[in-house]
Amino acid sequence: MSNMPNIKIGVVAVSRDCFPESLSVNRRKALIDAYKAKYGEEHIYECPVCIVESEIHMVQALEDVKAAGCDALVVYLGNFGPEIAETLLAKHFDGPKMFIAAAEESGDSLMDGRGDAYCGMLNASYNLKLRNVKAYIPEYPIGTAEECADMIHEFEPIARAIVALNSLKIISFGPRPLNFLACNAPIKQLYNLGVEIEENSELDLFEAFNKHE
């Protein structure tokens, strides 16, 4: 028996309107191809909506990943990225999220192929903090398609742990009776993790035992 959640990660590309949208879209496709080639397609979903400085696009992407059954979210900056829409997406997505960004492929296409996603990543992290949105950002979040695919794979166990904890309920037995939280053991950090806890006394256990006879 396995009690670990099966994670599906939705990848949403974002683009600033002063950069070609196609740059983010093509980089997203390359990222998804790199991931599937190395890790398979069971845990990944490519959102077809590219957010281009639009809250309408943000809502469309949010509804799409929800409809696809995604448990976790990757916001992928194919270029500088729209700070408002991309962080609003993270705010409204109810689940673990990660931000990563595309490195420049080469110095030969800096007219149409330059994305400045490194700078966009700095601004995105600052805006996440302003909104008090918790998101996972790798130690070095900028990479090629293959490197970003590895980052997503490394994010999977993190996302799985968060989803599992948010669905966890601990039923414990100790000296305190049921529903006396004021005199319960320190449980705030469990609540902060999204864990629910129910503590029962020995008398509660005895009563439950007798009811099952």
Language model: regions and residue ranges:
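Metallocofactor- and cofactor-centric catalytic cores in central/energy metabolism, strongly enriched
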Residues: 1-162, 167-171, 176-213
